[in-house]
Amino acid sequence: TYPVEKIKKKIPDLVESLKTVQNKYVWIKAASAIKTTDTIPKLAFEECKIGEKNVKIYGIAKGSGMIAPNMATMLAFIFTDADLSANILKSLLKRNIDSTFNAITVDGDTSTNDMLTFFSTGKVNNPNIENILDPRLINFEKKLHNVMLNLSLQIIKDGEGAKKLVKINISKA
């Protein structure tokens, strides 16, 4: 005999996990769709809380050549379901761009064709944040930085002709 009751109990969990798998698949498809000379799709994901609300940050990017400091021939799209204003999103990007996307180079060639955008769907009804210094943004900003750094590193690891990844840390300069 089959354990029908046990199976019935697990169906809601299965449906939820399928939604998660389907969601990840959609992001992989999106990252694959924007590839040009890239050999792999580039995507990153983080979760955290703003107040008591769970929020997600997804990012996809393309680029593998003409990547020099201050971005070049690359596209990056970051999305969050957090409800944050355009001013907050802009400030968060400004605070994190120099140590991520603006710090990478592949071949030293630059281009005018680069872009990073940050979208908020506002789907999550998190607490209203009006100031970039609001302590409820601390963990969110860390997670955003992780997504941006992850995507930046994926771009240079997939650089045209890249065989090595070199990180230079300068202290007491």
What are the language-model segments listed below?
Residues 1-16, 20, 111-114, 151, ...:
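Proteins with a high burden of low-complexity, intrinsically disordered sequence enriched in S/T/G/P/A and R
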Residues 1-101:
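Glycine-rich, mobile lid/loop segments that gate access to catalytic sites or pores
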Residues 1-8, 75-76, 113-133:
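Glycine-rich, flexible beta-strand/loop modules in the N-terminal catalytic cores of phosphate-handling
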Residues 22-31, 45, 101-113, 150-167:
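Flexible, glycine/charged-enriched surface loops at secondary-structure junctions
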Residues 38, 61-65, 82, 107-117, ...:
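Glycine-rich beta-alpha junction loops
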Residues 56-59, 77, 117-118, 167-170:
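Structured core elements
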Residues 65-70, 88, 107-111, 115, ...:
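Short, contiguous, pocket-lining structural segments
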Residues 118-173:
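A glycine- and small/hydrophobic-rich beta-loop-beta segment
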